[in-house]
Amino acid sequence: MAKRDYYEVLGVSKTAEEREIKKAYKRLAMKYHPDRNQGDKEAEAKFKEIKAAYEVLTDAQKRAAYDQYGHAAFEQGGMGGGFNGGADFSDIFGDVFGDIFGGGRGRQRAARGADLRYNMDLTLEEAVRGVTKEIRIPTLEECDVCHGSGAKAGTQPQTCPTCHGSGQVQMRQGFFAVQQTCPHCQGRGTLIKDPCHKCHGHGRVEKSKTLSVKIPAGVDTGDRIRLAGEGEAGEHGAPAGDLYVQVQVKQHPIFEREGNNLYCEVPINFAMAALGGEIEVPTLDGRVKLKVPSETQTGKLFRMRGKGVKSVRGGSQGDLLCRVVVETPVGLSEKQKQLLKDLQESFGGPTGEKNSPRSKSFFDGVKKFFDDLTR
């Protein structure tokens, strides 16, 4: 069967720059990669065709030969035109295809251990003051029998006889030698003849471990604490991953936190709001007295400096802001109701101008609104 033109395969012109070729290759490789089209023979054939076109058109020597001789340049025996191969393709997939599907160059390194995440719930008090907590996590630990090698005690992994430890083998394609991952050792460069009886050659075993985690004062929801090397053990002696402790602060019954400031609502009765006085308000360090001036309205904020949260990164401490809520009295006796009626009369009715300036302003605005509508 005649082979399609490589430029046509990638959908680029014969004058396309390498950047355009790589872009086209990435797009098509994503579409036809076998991992995305399992069992689809047509997609697999298409992918091989795309790969072959890319290998030729991104190599200056190969591309020149292809432009001159076409596919004949790569058939066994070739055109005999002073062209004697040796191009190294070990970085083709590292530079382009590896970015998409995780391929690598040369011998594969043993994989670093996976990072782990632990969600930790804290009370507001614990988050503000700091705390040390013990946690228990399931993980993969280095095998204590083979010490991560995967080989039976007293033995060592052997150098792969196929690739001689390089993790790569060369295959001839016409004039050219193409490097591929060794199919015998899967790119590791070593083989385990006698696997460890405990980890069965993996170098890691499942375990649970207990850690003591120091939470610094001032942390908040969303903060992460990194414990280096406390993640899963790496493969065959590779470095371990890290453990990330994700902080979540529970809702507090009294305080709300915004940054390093704390907020709380303080209810007072309308007599205290009108006449003023002194009340006790809570802080994280205990109760403190707060002076309420006369004629205090709902929503007024009182700032208590330095009664908030100290920044986890050092520096100044936040404040406590107390928001006053003036409560309407309930469960009134007949006598209290009469007293309130007398008080209302003394105000000059519900919209008393002198004693309720905001009410007068509001009702004056309402009256003007309706007057304007009827004009």
Curated annotation (Swiss-Prot):
The keyword Zinc applies. A zinc finger (CR-type) spans 130-208. Disulfide bonds: none annotated. It comes from the Bacteria. Zn(2+) 2 binds at residues 160, 163, 182, 185. It is found in: Cytoplasm. Residues 5-70 form the J domain. CXXCXGXG motif repeats lie at residues 143-150, 160-167, 182-189, 196-203. One of its GO terms (cellular component) is cytoplasm. Its main location: cytoplasm. Participates actively in the response to hyperosmotic and heat shock by preventing the aggregation of stress-denatured proteins and by disaggregating proteins, also in an autonomous, DnaK-independent fashion. Unfolded proteins bind initially to DnaJ; upon interaction with the DnaJ-bound protein, DnaK hydrolyzes its bound ATP, resulting in the formation of a stable complex. GrpE releases ADP from DnaK; ATP binding to DnaK triggers the release of the substrate protein, thus completing the reaction cycle. Belongs to the DnaJ family. Homodimer. PANTHER family: CHAPERONE PROTEIN DNAJ, DNAJ HOMOLOG 1, MITOCHONDRIAL-RELATED. The J domain is necessary and sufficient to stimulate DnaK ATPase activity. Zinc center 1 plays an important role in the autonomous, DnaK-independent chaperone activity of DnaJ. Zinc center 2 is essential for interaction with DnaK and for DnaJ activity. This is Chaperone protein DnaJ. It comes from Salmonella arizonae (strain ATCC BAA-731 / CDC346-86 / RSK2980).
